[in-house]
C-alpha cells in the first residue's frame, strides 16, 4: 500500500513571520495542528469554518493568558495555504484582519489561475 503524500504548506504574506513571534508553546501547538492537516488528519487545535473570508477557509484557534492566536488557512488539493496569522484581545475579529485574509485569498486565486493558464500554454507548445 502506498504511503499518502504529505500536503505542502505555503505561507502567504507575513503569516509565518507573525507566527514566529508567538510564545514557543503556542507555535508548537499550531505546528502540530498544521502537521496533522498535512497528513489529512483533524487538527489538534480547535478549528472552525471562516465563511466570512471565503469558501473552504478555516481558522485554527489557541489562547493563553496574554492573547488569542489565530491562523487562517485554506486547503486546495495537496496544498495548505496559510492566509494569515494574527493575535486578538477581544472576542471579535478585527475588520482589518478579515480584510487582509480576504485580500490574500483573492491574490492566491488569481495566482493559481495564472499558473494554470501558463501550464496549459506550456503543454500546448
Regions found by a protein language model. Give the residues of each.
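Basic, Lys/Arg-enriched alpha-helical interface segments
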Residues: 1-68, 76-80, 87-125
